[in-house]
Amino acid sequence: MSDEEHQFESKADAGASKTYPQQAGTIRKNGHIVIKGRPCKVVEVSTSKTGKHGHAKCHFVAIDIFTGKKLEDIVPSSHNCDVPHVNRTDYQLIDISEDGFVSLLTENGNTKDDLRLPTDDNLLTQIKDGFAEGKDLVVSVMSAMGEEQICALKDIGPK
């Protein structure tokens, strides 16, 4: 045994899976699903009856939670689909750099500096204008499958 104290930075997720399996027939509208390797929010589900050859099928129409692109997939209802672990975390906005990155304050007092401003023009304008006016802003960051993006903004009053 050594008397040294080891400090570990918790950057990784300990090898935890980015997705979990769920039977296609149990995935509902407003749920999440992985289509073509992208985490998506389901906007429409339709099920076809069992045919002469095989299973009932689920037709998913979903929107990529990061790019907003519409994706579709057809899966037998008895088969498993990958469902992404989707997390939303709120951070206080501290600073916006010239190169488009934001500096965020985490709950434990550390800063998170590896996120870009969102690509959504409306949200981008709200963040820049609110920050320029000196408001205290809290941004919601959505993370799934190793990607993170600012998805919402809350104004918690003047500084």
UniProtKB/Swiss-Prot annotation:
Region feature Disordered, mapped onto this chain: 1-23
InterPro entries, per the entry: IF5A-like (IPR001884), IF5A-like_N (IPR048670), NA-bd_OB-fold (IPR012340), Rib_uL2_dom2 (IPR014722), Trans_elong_IF5A_hypusine_site (IPR019769), Transl_elong_IF5A_C (IPR020189), Translation_prot_SH3-like_sf (IPR008991)
Biological process terms in GO annotation: positive regulation of translational elongation; positive regulation of translational termination
Entry keyword set: Hypusine, Initiation factor, Protein biosynthesis
Modified residues (Hypusine): K52
Name of one Pfam family that matches: eIF-5a
This protein's record includes keyword Protein biosynthesis: yes
Modified how: Lys-52 undergoes hypusination, a unique post-translational modification that consists in the addition of a butylamino group from spermidine to lysine side chain, leading to the formation of the unusual amino acid hypusine. eIF-5As are the only known proteins to undergo this modification, which is essential for their function.
Keyword set includes Disulfide bond: no
Gene3D superfamilies: 2.30.30.30, Nucleic acid-binding proteins
Domain of life: Eukaryota
GO molecular-function terms, A-Z: ribosome binding; RNA binding; translation elongation factor activity; translation initiation factor activity
PANTHER family for this protein: TRANSLATION INITIATION FACTOR 5A FAMILY MEMBER
Note: There are at least two genes for eIF-5A in tobacco: 5A1 may regulate the light-dependent translation of specific transcripts while 5A2 may be a housekeeping protein.
Functional summary from the UniProt entry: Translation factor that promotes translation elongation and termination, particularly upon ribosome stalling at specific amino acid sequence contexts. Binds between the exit (E) and peptidyl (P) site of the ribosome and promotes rescue of stalled ribosome: specifically required for efficient translation of polyproline-containing peptides as well as other motifs that stall the ribosome. Acts as a ribosome quality control (RQC) cofactor by joining the RQC complex to facilitate peptidyl transfer during CAT tailing step.
Family: Belongs to the eIF-5A family.
NCBIfam families, per the entry: eIF_5A
Protein's recorded name: Eukaryotic translation initiation factor 5A-2
Native species: Nicotiana plumbaginifolia
Lineage, broadest ranks: Eukaryota, Viridiplantae, Streptophyta, Embryophyta, Tracheophyta
